[in-house]
């Protein structure tokens, strides 16, 4: 049953690359087979509940620009928001969604009231999922917006805040389990510091490590089969976050014995804030064995802020999905649009148009990436570049060589290697042929 919020807009369909209809897909065809798999199953698109249905269009200099009929702190409004959300998922044809607890439920006066409200809306979500076939990609807890978390959640100097956060994660893991969620995400927006003058760095890291171990212990206790994911970000809102980037997260996981239990959810915009490319973070996560899922968006390259815009750069998407394919594709993860409208885009149709453009961009990137994989456009030159390491001598040097034995061989065989071109320009031109 229609809520009426989207007027007379009907289900978004694939019309092909020649279509000029803004409410149609030009490149995303869910049933198109790419490398032996349906496009929908490769991309596993999800809609972010928070940016799509909760964000009011504020900025540091101005208030709400979006007028939504569910912008009230009541259970009735929460259920209307859910009605509109699931109608949106069906119009768009996205198979998944993601949410924080605070996105979905009214804010209560106590932990018990929050839990009661969450349980009620989770039951409502469960019925919506049964009615529509839409599934939960991942759930998470908002432990950064409420003022109690201004000094962190797991890293807060107040043990009562740590306890409140731990209890909140328990309820959110329970909710994710009940809804059949395929992952559970932790993003530490306040797990960091503003100044070292009032921060015990080691204690906060130790507390965060213990907190995450508790999450993993509870996951196994309740039989949750999904992945636990950390989402790296270098700063914003904290001056310095402890989950700065993939490399930092991996070091943290190794320190606290969690590298086999926890993976990463990598966001395009966060990678850029950390001074990396998206594909760098994806490639590193794959190399370290912790690749899990992605949040798709883009930043404004001039402002330096985490602007969470919809992706529209096909070459960037091609290189990103190339790394996803190199990792074997998604297992429990997917492509969550952690993207929001610009505050001047106030029409309901804008919500659909933003996602349509992002989905088309990702589809084009996936197809280009798949063709590069099939043609060995990059893997062939890469194999040639490292071919010397396939020789018996090179393998023996790594396996049993010492500095003394290697030095003796270099001198005895008069080894004098000459540089070989890295062919970066050629490879960049190759990529451009596919995008």
From Swiss-Prot:
SUPFAM superfamilies in the record: Xylose isomerase-like (SSF51658)
GO cellular component: cytoplasm
InterPro entries on file: Xyl_isomerase-like_sf (IPR036237), Xylose_isom_bac (IPR013452), Xylose_isomerase (IPR001998)
Keyword Cytoplasm set for record: yes
EC number: 5.3.1.5
Binding residues for Mg(2+): 306, 308
Entry superkingdom: Bacteria
Cofactor notes: Binds 2 magnesium ions per subunit.
Subcellular location(s) of the protein: Cytoplasm
Record keywords, A-Z: Carbohydrate metabolism, Cytoplasm, Isomerase, Magnesium, Metal-binding, Xylose metabolism
Co-factor requirement: Mg(2+)
Substrates-to-products reaction catalysed: alpha-D-xylose = alpha-D-xylulofuranose
NCBIfam families (UniProt xref): PRK05474.1, xylose_isom_A
Family: Belongs to the xylose isomerase family.
Quaternary structure note: Homotetramer.
Protein name: Xylose isomerase
């Amino acid at each position: 049953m229609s809520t009426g919020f989207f007027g007379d807009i009907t289900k978004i369909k694939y019309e092909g690359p020649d279509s000029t209809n803004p409410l149609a897909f030009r490149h995303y065809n869910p049933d198109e087979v790419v490398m032996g798999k349906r496009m929908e199953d490769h991309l596993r698109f999800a809609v972010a509940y928070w940016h799509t249905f909760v964000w009011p269009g504020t900025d540091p200099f101005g208030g709400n620009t979006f007028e939504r009929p569910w912008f009230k702190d009541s259970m009735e409004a929460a259920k209307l928001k859910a009605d509109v959300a699931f109608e949106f998922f069906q119009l768009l044809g996205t198979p998944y969604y993601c949410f924080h607890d605070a996105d979905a439920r009214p804010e209560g006066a106590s932990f018990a009231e929050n839990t009661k409200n969450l349980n009620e809306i989770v039951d409502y979500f469960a019925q919506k999922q049964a009615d529509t076939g839409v599934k939960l990609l991942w759930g998470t807890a908002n432990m950064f917006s409420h003022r109690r978390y201004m000094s962190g959640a797991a890293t807060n100097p107040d043990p009562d805040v740590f306890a409140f956060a731990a209890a909140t994660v328990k309820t959110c893991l329970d909710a994710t389990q009940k809804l059949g969620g395929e992952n559970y995400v932790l993003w530490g927006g306040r797990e960091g510091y503003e100044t070292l003058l009032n921060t015990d760095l080691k204690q906060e890291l130790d507390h965060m490590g213990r907190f995450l171990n508790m999450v993993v212990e509870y996951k196994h206790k309740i039989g949750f089969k999904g992945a636990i994911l950390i989402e790296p970000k270098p700063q914003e809102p904290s001056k310095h976050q402890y989950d700065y980037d993939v490399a930092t997260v991996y070091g943290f996981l190794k320190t606290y014995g969690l590298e086999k239990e926890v993976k990463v959810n990598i966001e395009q915009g966060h990678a850029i804030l950390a001074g990396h490319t998206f594909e760098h973070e994806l490639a590193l996560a794959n190399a370290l064995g912790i690749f899990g899922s992605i949040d798709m968006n883009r930043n404004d390259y001039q402002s330096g802020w985490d602007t969470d815009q919809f992706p529209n750069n096909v070459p960037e998407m091609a290189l990103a999905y190339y790394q996803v394919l190199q990792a074997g594709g998604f297992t429990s993860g997917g492509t969550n649009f952690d993207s929001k409208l610009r505050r001047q885009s106030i029409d309901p149709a804008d919500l659909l148009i933003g996602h349509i453009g992002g989905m088309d961009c990702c589809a084009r990137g996936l197809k280009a990436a798949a063709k590069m994989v099939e043609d060995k456009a990059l893997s062939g030159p890469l194999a040639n570049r490292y071919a010397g390491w396939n020789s018996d001598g090179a393998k023996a040097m790594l396996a049993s060589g010492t500095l003394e034995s290697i030095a003796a061989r270099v001198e005895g065989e008069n080894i004098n290697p000459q540089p070989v071109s890295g062919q970066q320009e050629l490879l960049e031109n190759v990529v451009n042929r596919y995008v």
